[in-house]
Amino acid sequence: MKTLKTIALFAVLVCPVSLAKAQNNINGITTAYFGLKNALATGSGAAAENSAKALMGALSAPEKLNADQQKIFDTYIDKLKFDTRHISEVSDIEHQREHFESLSKNLYEVLKGLKMNTATVYMDYCPMKKAYWLSETSAIKNPYYSDKSMATCGKTTATLAAVK
């Protein structure tokens, strides 16, 4: 009986720490992704290249995922790394944006499935490009068109609420 109480107390104390570590990892991934999105929105291929390198460094499996979460992460991690690596190796912004499109779709599926984002994430859509991206704010900053006339082209189509 004493052993069960000890195990229960350990689980109560350790589980929140494990969740916090996993959420910190997800926050690192989303923060790096948003840096990449913002670099593309400014039209800087060089900045996007550097931001993709930061994202590549952040792309690692969060600790303590349950079996369903691990399956989701495993389904998408190679795709996320492929697009991120490609963006980090080229400076042509149009080519970067092509890979950013699939990167965004795949990261959305990961975040939606893991339910570990501690900040609200917005999924935005550009009708001109027919492409989606994720944003940290509800304000539209279009990463597919950086010229002033198209910088705010788009609309929010989904919201992933913050998980506390």
Regions found by a protein language model. Name each.
Residues P16, A20-K164:
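Intrinsically disordered, low-complexity terminal tails/loops enriched in metal-binding residues
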Residues M1-N25:
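Bacterial Sec-dependent N-terminal signal peptides
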